[in-house]
Amino acid sequence: MRMDKLTSRFQQALADAQSLAVGRDHNIIEPVHVLAALLDQSGGSTRPLLSQAGVNVPLLRERLGEALDTLPKVSGQEGNLSIGNDLNRLLNQTDKLAQQHGDAFIASEWFVLAAADDASPLGVALRAAGGDKKKIEAAIDKLRGGETVQSENAEEQRQALEKYTIDLTARAESGKLDPVIGRDEEIRRTIQVLQRRTKNNPVLIGEPGVGKTAIVEGLAQRIINGEVPEGLRGKRVLSLDMGALIAGAKFRGEFEERLKAVLSDLSKNEGQIILFIDELHTMVGAGKADGAMDAGNMLKPALARGELHCIGATTLDEYRKYIEKDAALERRFQKVFVGEPTVEDTIAILRGLKERYAVHHGVEITDPAIVAAATLSNRYITDRQLPDKAIDLMDEAASRIRMEIDSKPEELDRLERRLIQLKIQREMLKKEKDDASRQRLADLETDIDKLEREFYDLNELWKSEKAALQGTTKVKEQIEHAKLELEAAQRRQDYAKMSEIQYGVLPQLEKQMALANEVEHHDFKLVQDRVTAEEIAEVVSRWTGIPVNKMLEGERDKLLRMEDELHHRVVGQNEAIKVVSDAVRRSRAGLSDPNRPSGSFLFLGPTGVGKTELCKALADFLFDSTEAMIRIDMSEFMEKHSVARLIGAPPGYVGYEEGGYLTEAVRRRPYSLILLDEVEKAHPDVFNILLQVLDDGRLTDGQGRTVDFRNTVIVMTSNLGSHQIQELSGDDSAEAYTQMKAAVMGVVQAHFRPEFINRLDDIVVFHPLDKAQIKSIARIQLQGLEKRLAERGLKLDLDDAALEVLGSVGFDPVYGARPLKRAIQSQVENPLAQQILSGQYLSGDSVRVRADGGRLVFTKD
């Protein structure tokens, strides 16, 4: 017999049989070796063939093992391996059967058929396991589907649907799919398209996360439950696994061969299978090589002839990018648009899924948590779609509660660490012999005993609480399983089983659940098993950095005392601080307009009066870090072409992929303070971009993505009108301030357009600084120097007279507080640096700074 006339699978089986014989020290290859090798082949057709023919495969394996054990062993004869007479005879019979059926290559199933009525030990083992020649022959006919073997790889192309698709109807039947709530209109539209005579291939198009795949799963569930028109009853929905189809296709044409086998199997089923291709755009260009056809082109004839009943799913962008370009492929599909569900629909979807997630995590998900997940995700997570983002919120919040249940509570952990510390101290004190150490040891023993009792009580409490929670989890799982069995019995119309579950098993389990709930108190001290709205808000805060969780008492007090906190860093400017504080309080109390930024201000005033410093202080107050402020120097945007840098370059320009300077910063940190410094120096076109930010709290970047500015505070600073402020300064009365503000506003209105000024929440005019305020600023600025000296082990001591000197030297009504910084450098830092370097001051010394005749004198204390 020519080996090249065997299929590749059969050749591989003979090679494996030879290897098996060598491993068992057999010098003759027998038929049992070959069948054992065929059964062990991964992805082979022998096992499913025998199972279909009613053969008990585990028993057959057992009998084959016994037959192999009875074969004689010969050691030291590994090179003298030969084919036995029984195997030779069987192979000839196999060749004969293949020729009778018109096969060009000999397939492994004819070997199994030849063995069925053979007198060899293999035939005996096969018949003992239930092998019958007629049944095996019928199974072969079903497996081959009337086709002959015309290629070496023919066996590998069999059962293509089992290998390269996932049966969604089977998953729905076994209860592995999540329930699909709502989406009735889209499912009805999909069924409507599937029922058409031609072009009966719907393609579901929608944004990522709106539930396109869920619609197909919903269709599979409806088919299983018989809730579909007559034309779709009994059909199967198979999902094409593109990964399995491409994986391992090493040679050119292998991918096409697999896809052809899938299409061939589908045509054999004569419309009884609906193929679901998720991410349909991957078919365009898949398997494409030089001059080769891609998968999309291979699908076209089958779609046109109606042999392929297909549902596609893809996103809007990818449909436009890949499918619309191929008009011949596009016309064979009928578009079904899947929109984002409303918040109310999302709440209904979450209520349907709640039970599955609660059972998986072993926690209780409350209804307020579901409402919070839908509303908060819609309000704060703007770059993703409902219901996906709301489901993720619920899932992560439940996961967090589960993790807290499984891990040791913080209180218990702290006690354990304290005990370890005390025990280490006890071991050290045992080595000491003096009376004081013995006394300390006795005190320590008392403390350890007390802590150990406390730890034991808490540990027992934790274990009992945890056990109570686990009890309810098991009952919930049993209820879920019983409901799935009830649905399966309903489909089979097994009324006896339905009655048993509905009136026996389920009431019993619900009674157990009620008892478990009585034991389980929700006011547990250490563990909490309920997901509430607070947990959902906590997850949103972690995702976005926006503080949407319930305010703690400490934070409320801090917000009420906000003006005092800001005055620690900004001297004077009461009006500006009040305006900014009110805006932040409105936002945190949830009273500000949800479709506009939390606050938008224009700070006006001469240089050095604290405009930028107030922004830094505000960022520090809100985010505990001045780094959280997005600072953009508007003098960088003086030219017209530089405006695009704020939102990103348009398509076709260099830097398109990088995104915008402003938009990318806000996308990464949606809760932030944006400082547009020296705004009057920017090109007028910048203000056109800012109009929609100030009005609608949104901005579209160069890539077409909408960036949310609703949680930002926007502050613009400007020196416009500083000349008028200087002229009218000196009078602290309210009338003088009103007159000054009117003069400044005249300059502002002449420079900025009315539509820009009209969109701002407030325009604040900063007061020029007086001598007393400069002295207070000097005290604040010297705190930084004191901190730096403290790192070197030195202490700084300045009296009021020295501060007066610094204030008078650093006071300049035109330049504000900036000359003060230079005065501190020249009067304090420079002489002090020289004296430290010369060794006059060492670590631990105190530096006294005193005034003497208008100059500062340094002495060591």
From Swiss-Prot:
Subcellular location field: Cytoplasm
Chain sites annotated for binding ATP 2: 605-612
NBD1: annotated span: 159-340
Coiled coil, from the record: 391-523
Subunit-level organization: Homohexamer. The oligomerization is ATP-dependent.
Region (Repeat 2): 83-146
Database matches in SMART domains: AAA, ClpB_D2-small
Region (C-terminal), start-end ranges: 769-861
Gene source species: Xanthomonas axonopodis pv. citri (strain 306)
Residues that bind ATP 1: 206-213
InterPro entries attached to this UniProt entry: AAA+_ATPase (IPR003593), ATPase_AAA_core (IPR003959), Chaperonin_ClpB (IPR017730), Clp_ATPase_C (IPR019489), Clp_N_dom_sf (IPR036628), Clp_R_dom (IPR004176), ClpA/B (IPR001270), ClpA/B_CS1 (IPR018368)
Sequence ranges assigned to domain Clp R in this UniProt record: 3-146
One Pfam family linked to the record: Clp_N
GO MF annotation list: ATP binding; ATP hydrolysis activity
Role summary: Part of a stress-induced multi-chaperone system, it is involved in the recovery of the cell from heat-induced damage, in cooperation with DnaK, DnaJ and GrpE. Acts before DnaK, in the processing of protein aggregates. Protein binding stimulates the ATPase activity; ATP hydrolysis unfolds the denatured protein aggregates, which probably helps expose new hydrophobic binding sites on the surface of ClpB-bound aggregates, contributing to the solubilization and refolding of denatured protein aggregates by DnaK.
Region annotated Repeat 1, chain positions: 6-71
Region (NBD2): 555-768
Protein's UniProt name: Chaperone protein ClpB
SUPFAM superfamilies: Double Clp-N motif, P-loop containing nucleoside triphosphate hydrolases
